[in-house]
Every structure is written in structure tokens, then in C-alpha cells.
């Protein structure tokens, strides 16, 4: 299969490198420095005591105009429209898009470029750390869950086979929107709070005052999810967040790293979308609105 990885950060490089063992993979990025480094040095993946190197043919966004079978989207979800518009040459009527991005409403954006039945959404427990351009260390392994945006299970199974063949533990969900909601509870709490308090993930549970904020945001988000047709048990949601803090809490969230490095975050696709849904259902979401405004305020100070 011919695959284009759009966005060559840690996750794009990791997934692309693994898939390149059995597929033809090209890498697309918006930064010339990244493109030059990948072409010259390839990709290095570190997993435990094992280090592997991969060739990485890379192109500047908009410069690769051959259609592909699959686009793997690893830019920030707030950059989807710009990235895909720049790279429209990748698409034909059969091209599949896989997005493992955080946030809501991604399928609506992708459907501007491919048919909804060609869109696979998902979530992954895999977490990688970028040590340098094209040098990636696996921090946490885990399951990747895929699902069709329009209940095209055959397509989701195709994605599962593709990833499984390259060593990814992959499952298919019949209700990917519920999976996205489950992932959202973690992202709308731990991401902004670690960024605001400049702390590791584990501190969100260890510090009782931050944990009180986690509970407030999570409970409010559960109420919005119910209005959207999805019911969740608050105790189970908080247990999920607590377990992540305890078991995977030594690292830093993506939003913390974005703020630290003065990059724009995905806050509008996370808490911002919760606020939008609340507005849609004529409900207030003051906790989500507070962290949305707080992170946006920090971004304006860069």
C-alpha cells in the first residue's frame, strides 16, 4: 500500500517507520528543516534497549502531488484544513484517511477532501517522545482503536489488518464516537491542567486542589456527553483519569509541551468543542470555558 504520513512529529515518524516495513511510505511536513533532516538521516526509533533506523523519503507540504492509497494524519487537529488543502494532490476517489487525533468534529473536516465512507477515526494508547528531528523514543505502548465515521466496518477492518501487519495491537470499535468521548475525558482535564500548572501528569492526582479541578471539569463534560446521547458513569471516568495519573504520570502531556515551547495548542478542539456543544444544547460549561480561556490567554502572551 502507498501511504503518505502528513505531519512528521514523534507519532507520525513512529507509525510511518513501522508501516514502512511492509508498505511504501512517504513523509509530508510543513517545515523544510524537518524534510531535509528526514531525507538525510532517516528515522531512528528507540524501543527499550532496541534501536532501529529507517529510510524516510520526505517532501515539503504541497510538493508531493501523486495520489496515495492511505493518508495518515498526524498534524494537530487545529491544522487539518490547512494541511489537507496544501496536500490535495494526495487524494483520489479511493484514498483512505486515518486520523488518530484528539478532538471532536474531525470527520466533518476530513469529508471536505474524501468521501465519509473513506474516513477512519481512532484513538491510540501509544505515546512517543521526540528526542530530535526523526529520532523518536517509545514512551508507552498500547492498543490502537479504529472505527468508521459512517459505520463502514469493512473499511475499519482494513485499517486493523494494515496496522496489525506492522506490529500494532489494533481493535475495531462499532461505536467510535463513544471511544472519542472516553478519550476526551482525559484530554479535557489532564492536558489543560498540566499546561496551566506546569506539572507532570501524576501531579494532577497527587495535588488535591488540582484533582478537585479534574473532578469539576470531568463531571461537567459527562453532563454535556449525556446531552449528546452518550451516558458515562462519573466514578468510572474518574477512575480512568486517576489510573493514567498513577500508571503513566511521569511524563508530560502534549499541551504542557506545547505551552512550554510556545506553540499553539489543541484547546479549541478539546475544551472549546465541549463549550460549543454546551451552547448547542443551551447548557453552561463554566469549567471548560475557564480552561479554554486560560490556555488561549497564555497563547496570546507568546
Enumerate the language-model features and the residues they cover.
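Short alpha-helical
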Residues: 32-33, 78-79, 104-105, 154, ...
